[in-house]
Amino acid sequence: MLDRLAFLQQLPLLLKGTSDDDTPCPGYLYEEFAKISYESVGSCQCLLEYLLNRLQTSSCHVKLKVLKILLSLCFHGSPQFIQDLRRNSAYIQEAAAVSGPPDPLHGISLYQKVRVTAQEIVGNLFSESIPSPSHTVSAKERSQSGMGSQASSAPALHGFGYSQEEKNLGNSKDTFLNGIQRAAVAVTHSVLPGAGLSHTHACERADDAYKPVAIPSTDRRPLPGNSLPTSAHRGCHRSGVPGGGWDESDSGNSSQESPHDKSPLSRSSDVGSKSGSDGQSRNSQRESLDITDRVEFTHLSDCQQEARLVQEVTWGKRVFLTQEESQQFVRGCSLLNCEVVFEMLNCSLTDDSNCIKLRSMCAISSLMASDLLSHEHMLAVVRQNLQTLTGGPPGPVKDKATKILRQFQALTQNFSERGAVHHETSPSPTTHCSLDLFADVIPHSVVSGLLTSLSVPSSPTLNVQNTVCSLPNGAANQKNPNGSTEKSDPAEELRVETGDHISTNIHVSLFEGMELVGTMKCSHKEDTIGYRAGGLSVEPAKEEPSKPTLSSVFSFLNT
């Protein structure tokens, strides 16, 4: 009765191992079932009864799991369980002939596996290869084989591939006594470490004795049998010293070691001690040197990718960057430190090669079009070098630098008058007060000519025409106040003739007297239009100098 109550505690494991699903039985449950068979005779009978009842179910999954458990117990179960299984082998033989309708998913494969496993169990039950009770090791003894320091004759934990070609382990009485002895030794070791050491392993544990932890050295190594002195590795504490006031291990005996046995770090500390400094100054000097080296190494390693990117952009066969190169450069800047890249581009503007300068300025223009850096920051970095380039000789470098400065002026809107670019073609002091962004495209002289009014107001051109028209046609030369003769310009003669021709043939227009502005398209006709207006306004200007009268179809309105 007590065995059955104890068996009920193992029922969850049995239900898990024989569940009706596709999941295989976990491997650790096979060992648990073997332990149940060794607990008592009643537990062994209850286990066999439960497994045979589960074998009678109609599910092939349950049958297959039960047969695999029985096959495992044939090799690792108790002798009592194997003997009872032989008496009830009819259930196994019945499972060896099982068949049924095919499964929708697996077909008849499950039935084949069940039959093969059942036939294997029957063959192992009645064969001579089954280990005898005297050679069988209990599960409790196998579980204690890994605790503490076991004897050399202790059996190893064998799996399914265990072969019988092992030495004789003795009878069950000796095995039981050996298990009790190993358990006692394990308990003694856990309570009193180092007690109960056997003499057989004394020599093996001699080399495993505790040794103080030592820092490995590349130049020298201690002998295997001798342990390092603990005083040489014990640090000395000083209050008020950076780093907690702890000296390194080589600072205490640095004066006693030979120069050949010292590491480079200890040699640097010895040099500091010979110069008259104490241990505190040596530590401070060593820390400062380490920090400097570390900062320099980090700086160089951090800027390598930026320098490589700038080198790829500035060094090329073409003078200007292609669209693909500009996009690739901006994409690379977004992944790296943009400020460092821009400073390197600024340094490239001082190069002697014009190609490098132009490619650098193209890269700067690409960064201006992106939002990686602010325009104020970019202008503050490259302003001086760009102004230097604009003051250089005429050429593409000067034009490109001028264009970039004008772009910065329009983007930042706070560019001072001192930084504005001065034109060589406009020496008047009023031209540099405000800059035109498109001055490079359309010259300033052409723009002023195209925007000339076609109205009647008095102009130098009109006065010259009237003066020339009053002279005879044969007078080609004039006298200056100094008495010298000056030959008239052929263009002026053409302008006079055109004016005379228009004055004789007057055409009335609806748009006379209106303020007209010449268009940008017909720049070659502006002189003709101007002459026509000038010719029409000669005689009315003499009648009323204050208010010129025009010949128009709307003249009747002036009453």
From Swiss-Prot:
- What would be one Gene Ontology cellular-component term for the protein? trans-Golgi network membrane
What residue spans carry the Low complexity bias annotation? 144-154, 266-281
Q: How does it sit in the membrane?
A: Peripheral membrane protein
Q: Name one Pfam family in it.
A: ENTH
The cellular location(s) given in this protein's UniProt record come to: Golgi apparatus, trans-Golgi network membrane; Cytoplasmic vesicle; Cytoplasm, Cytosol
Q: Which UniProt keywords apply?
A: Cytoplasm, Cytoplasmic vesicle, Golgi apparatus, Membrane
Predominant localisation class: Golgi
Q: What does this protein do?
A: May play a role in vesicular trafficking of proteins at the trans-Golgi network.
Q: What is this protein called?
A: AP-4 complex accessory subunit tepsin
**Species for this entry:** Xenopus laevis
